[in-house]
């Protein structure tokens, strides 16, 4: 192998090594349903008719309900499906933080599509 070939291989290897840490830091793509529009709608519902802010705080960092921004999922795996199921069904008192239950849909009259939007917003908070 001549000098030019070895130099080319060395440069290519250095480029791959340099790209490695950047590629490792990329977060996985959000699941279908977690779109900017769904997140914005969910944010609005969370802070208004969904009443989520009453227990999770206006910054979603928790009050009587748990912090939703720390990527620590207390009752499941943090997947979008898990969040949808949790918002839909709630959390019983015996499993809830501080023993305060989360009623289904947070006790508010939100639709299935609104539940999905809230779930997209919550997903975005815990998967930064």
Give short role names for the model-derived ranges.
Residues 42, 49-58, 102-103, 118-122:
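The canonical Cys-X-X-Cys-His
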Residues 24-47:
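Electrostatic cytochrome c docking/interface patches
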Residues 63-71, 90-128:
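Axial heme c-ligation environment in periplasmic c-type cytochrome domains
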Residues 1-11:
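Bacterial N-terminal signal peptides that target proteins for export
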Residues 19-21:
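N-terminal signal peptide c-region/cleavage motif recognized by signal peptidases
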